[in-house]
Curated annotation (Swiss-Prot):
InterPro entries: Cys-tRNA-ligase, Cys-tRNA-synt_Ia_DALR, Cys-tRNA/MSH_ligase, Rossmann-like_a/b/a_fold, tRNA-synt_1_cat_dom, tRNAsynth_Ia_anticodon-bd
GO molecular function: ATP binding; cysteine-tRNA ligase activity; zinc ion binding
Pfam family, one: DALR_2
Keywords assigned: Aminoacyl-tRNA synthetase, ATP-binding, Cytoplasm, Ligase, Metal-binding, Nucleotide-binding, Protein biosynthesis, Zinc
Name under which the protein is recorded: Cysteine--tRNA ligase
Family, similarity comment: Belongs to the class-I aminoacyl-tRNA synthetase family.
Species this chain originates from: Helicobacter pylori (strain P12)
Oligomeric and partner information: Monomer.
Length: 465
């Protein structure tokens, strides 16, 4: 298994701290609003990593957190007259619903920052004791980055260029020094009683503490195999996580760092600050979650994905092929490449080379359909074909529905009954040799984007996009 390590900037063999086991920490959302397609892409990218590792024989523990203590949450909670717990729980539920719709496997653990305050305080106390942190007059505590000679080694931000000394009035020693603890400022603030005084943790210390508390190993209590997240988290978040871990415990936080690329809208980076966010829940109003998943995984995870609906509909054709084969196999049988599982898994073991994997998938779909055309009654390889289709489900998380359910997405039960009534009416017209009426019914349904197909088993239908 090979993965691209952001820190070394090269593709390297994956060699976990414990043989045949992999522990992964993925930075989750700050829960003050609904999740957008950028969140979806990150979740799907590392869901693919998890699935690939599991099918390669690794025992995987994947942790994805919720940041439920943050300035944005506090500000919105006060504006809406809610507690931060009330507000964050709304968006945790929303995020969970969205990812379920995208068939993202549930993480092994989903810690909330608010559940690990004691661990955060202990880590800050360690940094103060070792003289890597300092407190300013308003009670805030900062990490002294000048004492970490490796600061910037992950993101390649050069402190001498990117930052400068600032006025003594502001009390921070360097502009890049980051807050570990924010003291309670009174009205419209949130604080927790602690040995550090009343206050709350900074964003970066939250994640590091949750990493150690949820993924600690006996032989490496302060290091994990893979730390992952979106490219926007590389600096300052991941850089600062790595820094405070080196300072507190003298080790690198993660053996490997992985980052997924941005999602662009109209060739511009999607972000809430730019006002061009495309929420998952809104996308799900127009497209089934499996169609969105199939589209978002279709571009290599490290590349930028420029979202547009034309490409989404083109990528849907791949899903159509999977379901057409599944539909055929459930009724008729044929042969398939016996090396398919090995070939597609090897593609994914090469830094999640999904483009190559999808090429192998396309080849399998085409060749299998050809063999079904040649041997429509051959039952010998039914189990193998269905096993390979199941493997696609497990590896890529697509093709999981019953074919009829997939091809009838977006049609209500009452509409389905109307269509079935029309099909029955058309059947009677054909029996009475009234082919003009039968064709008229077909055209009427087609005008409503319902296509009919006559098969040996009877007439089936599907919704066109």
């Amino acid at each position: 298994m090979f993965i691209y390590d952001t820190k070394s900037k090269q593709k390297v063999p994956f060699e976990p701290l414990v043989q045949n086991k992999a522990n992964i920490y993925v930075c989750g959302p700050t829960v003050y609003d609904d999740a957008h397609l950028g969140h979806a892409r990150s979740a799907i990218a590392f869901d693919l990593l998890r699935r690939t590792l599991e099918l390669s024989g690794y025992e995987v523990v994947l942790v994805r957190n919720f940041t439920d203590i943050d300035d944005k949450i506090i500000n919105k909670a006060f504006k809406e007259n809610k507690s931060i717990q009330e507000l964050s729980s709304i968006y945790i539920e929303s995020y969970t619903r969205d990812l379920n719709a995208l068939n993202v496997k549930k993480p092994s653990l989903e810690p909330k920052a608010s559940e690990y305050l004691d661990a955060m305080v202990r880590m800050i106390e360690t940094l103060l004791e070792k003289n890597f942190a300092y407190q300013v007059s308003n009670g805030d505590i900062y990490l002294d980055t000048s004492k970490d000679k490796d600061y910037g080694s992950l993101s390649m931000h050069n402190s001498s260029v990117e930052f400068s000394r600032i006025g003594l009035v502001q009390e921070k020693r360097l502009e890049q020094d980051f807050v570990l603890w924010k003291s309670y400022k009174g009205d419209n603030d949130v604080g927790f009683d602690s040995p550090l005084g009343k206050g709350r943790p900074g964003w970066h210390i939250e994640c590091s503490s949750m990493v150690f508390e949820t993924l600690a190993l006996a032989n490496a209590p302060y290091q994990i195999d893979i730390h992952a997240g979106g490219a926007d988290l590389l600096f300052p978040h991941h850089e600062n996580e790595a820094c405070q871990t080196r300072c507190a415990f003298g080790v690198e936080l993660a053996k490997y760092w992985m980052h997924n690329g941005f999602v662009n809208i109209n060739n511009e980076k999607m972000s809430k600050s730019l006002g061009n966010s495309f929420f998952i829940k809104d996308a799900l109003k127009n497209y089934d979650g499996e169609i969105l998943r199939n589209y978002l995984l279709g571009v290599h995870y490290r590349s930028v994905l420029n979202f547009n609906e034309e490409d989404l509909l083109v990528s849907k054709k791949r899903l159509d092929k999977i379901y057409r084969l599944k539909q055929r196999v459930l009724g008729t049988l044929g042969g398939i490449n016996p090396n398919f599982k090995k070939e597609i898994l090897e593609c994914m073991q090469d830094d999640l080379n999904v483009s190559k994997a999808l090429s192998v998938l396309e080849s399998m779909l085409s060749s299998t359909n050809e063999k079904l055309d040649q041997n429509p009654k051959n039952k010998a390889l039914k189990g193998e074909i269905l096993a390979n289709l199941k493997f696609i489900e497990e590896l890529l998380g697509i093709g999981v529905k019953d074919p009829s359910a997939y091809f009838q997405l977006g049609v209500s039960e009452s509409e389905k009954q109307e269509i079935e009534n029309k099909i029955e009416e058309r059947k009677r017209a054909k029996e009475q040799k009234d082919f003009l009426k039968a064709d008229s019914i077909r055209e009427e349904l087609l005008n409503h984007k319902i296509a009919l197909m006559d098969t040996p088993q009877g007439t089936i239908w599907e919704k066109l996009f």
